[in-house]
Amino acid sequence: MWQAIHEELAPEGLVVLTVAIDASLDEPRPFVERAHATHPSLVDIEHRVADLYNMVNVPTVLWIDEEGQIVRPQDVHYMSNEMASITHFHNRKPLAALRAWVREEAPAYPGDVAADTKVPTETDQEARAAFAVGWWLSQHGRAQAAERWFVRAGELAPHDFTIRRGSMPIRGIDPMGPAFFAMAGEWAQAGKPYYLPLPDTATSPEDYEVEPIPEMSIEELRAKLAAEP
């Protein structure tokens, strides 16, 4: 879908740049090749993007203008509605907002970008430092020591999927397996207190009325993912 929006809006000046936060260059390669991506598709194995822009989960989107200025705070923006019945994040409003901004029909954000941009707390920064230590140790053959730091990072930032889930493939844990679904279940049961869309693109019942989506349970999603090559 990112490729589709790139093809649609590139003639009007938009450049889509995707960054996969993954354990290796090979992990996202099949998805990039399957999409026949012609937009810049990068891989961040050190979690630098998540650190720089305080991203706690994916997908998180930033809009940057021609001057290199961030014109919209971190936002939740799914390009596909395949999992919308599970996440309850519909993409109708985010896509409409993006098109309107590119076509200069509306501002990028109606509020104060600086005031509404989510910044890390001291504990968040400590968690990312712990993750960085764990990552370095893992790259130097010290898996047991790395495990302690990854666990510590998750304890400091239980809300941060890029830390907790992001460490899973490095530690030999399936990032779409039981550990991830347990973590996602905790988030849902807690009322989804973090990783939420911005107010102007938040999902409403109207979105599902205008653009209905197929229902999918977590069990069905797991089965679908297991069946994919």
Regions found by a protein language model. Name each.
Residues M1-R34, I45-E46:
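Structural microenvironment flanking redox-active thiols in thiol-disulfide oxidoreductases
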Residues R29-V58, L62-I64:
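Short, internal strand/loop/helix patches
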Residues D65-R142, R171:
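Thiol-/selenol-based redox modules, centered on thioredoxin-like
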Residues D124, A157-P158:
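Short coil turns that delineate tetratricopeptide repeat
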Residues F131, R164-S167:
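Alpha-solenoid helical repeat scaffolds
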Residues I170-L198, V210-E211, A227:
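Alpha-helical linker/edge segments of TPR/alpha-solenoid repeat scaffolds
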